[in-house]
Regions:
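An amphipathic alpha-helix signature
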Residues: 33-45, 80-89, 105, 148, ...
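Short helix-coil transition/hinge motifs at the ends and kinks of transmembrane helices
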Residues: 48-56, 93-99, 161-168
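Active-site neighborhood of HAD-like aspartate-dependent phosphohydrolases
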Residues: 2-63
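Surface-exposed cleft-lining segments at the edges of enzyme active sites
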Residues: 110-120
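A metal-dependent, Asp-based hydrolase signature
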Residues: 62-111, 132
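Asp-based, Mg2+/Mn2+-dependent phosphohydrolase catalytic module
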Residues: 1-17, 127-134, 138-260
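Charged catalytic carboxylate motif
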Residues: 35, 39, 125, 187
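Catalytic beta/alpha-barrel core
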Residues: 121-122, 145
């Protein structure tokens, strides 16, 4: 465990850990990319049935790349079926492809009917990290920008896997903001009020420097862990009156060696 964080835990300076959910506790990125690729490939095969699979895969990749660019530019969360439709629409417009839009988009949307009924896989180190925090008797909670019911499904999966591994339950209260809300400090302020926590004594953990870390600090939180998901050095601008810990993932913060 990071020595400074361990010291903050042991001295009870930090009394709550508030997690972001997606790409922090569960691997939403992989789930998102795999499901979107499969759905778009299915749609592409209907639009271009005569083209060989290799060409269909190439077209699919181009559309997925467009979708990823659109996603990166969004200030608001966006549903996967809406994102896929926007990307496909841009592709067929650029390539001047004629399709029955109503039929194609309806079929594309239908392919995602179970998307928000399934939880992405928790990262391999998620359950252990939560257990390490619990060993300090520090409660945890979640704040997510995703829909309430989908967040509940993710939380339930984490709780079930925790119970299966350690033979005991764990409380994971969660708070969500509406999908139309901006990813800014207001959400973190609301999350703090919901969880009834002191932002100055809370450790925020998230994977987005802007939507999680800086937004939380702007909301008054003092401690944050930024998960980069890369082995490369990432330079982060520290903020006054706050401390940002930069690390690859939860495993490099709450690892087993810290308790040997």
């Amino acid at each position: 465990m990071n020595r400074e964080i361990k010291k903050l835990f042991k001295s009870s300076i930090i009394t709550f850990v508030l997690f972001d959910m997606d790409r922090t506790l569960v691997d939403t990125h992989t789930y998102f990319q795999e499901e979107m690729t499969n759905s778009i490939l299915h749609t592409v095969s209907k639009i271009f049935p005569a083209k060989p699979l290799k060409k269909q895969l190439k077209i699919t990749k181009e559309i997925v790349d467009i979708a990823n660019k659109i996603y990166e530019q969004q200030r608001y969360p966006i549903l996967v079926d809406t994102l896929s439709e926007l990307a496909l629409s841009q592709y067929i417009k650029e390539k001047k492809v004629k399709i029955n839009k109503k039929k194609v988009y309806k079929e594309l949307k239908s392919s995602y009917k179970d998307f928000y009924l399934t939880s992405p896989q928790p990262f391999p180190y998620t359950i252990e990290a939560i257990h390490k925090i619990k060993s300090f008797n520090i409660p945890i909670g979640v704040y997510s920008h995703a829909q309430n019911e989908w967040t509940r499904i993710k939380v339930d999966r984490i709780r079930n896997e925790y119970l299966k591994r350690y033979g005991e339950g764990i409380k994971i209260p969660f708070f969500t903001t509406d999908i139309t809300d901006l990813k800014d400090k207001e959400g973190w302020i609301k999350a703090g009020k919901y969880h009834k926590i002191n932002p100055k004594r809370t450790l925020v953990v998230g994977d987005s420097l802007t939507a999680d870390i800086y937004a939380a600090i702007d909301a008054g939180y003092k401690y944050a862990v930024y998960l980069t998901h890369t082995n490369k050095y990432v330079e982060v601008e520290q903020r006054a009156h706050a401390k940002i810990f930069v690390t690859k993932n939860l495993s490099t913060v709450f690892n087993q060696h810290s308790f040997l």
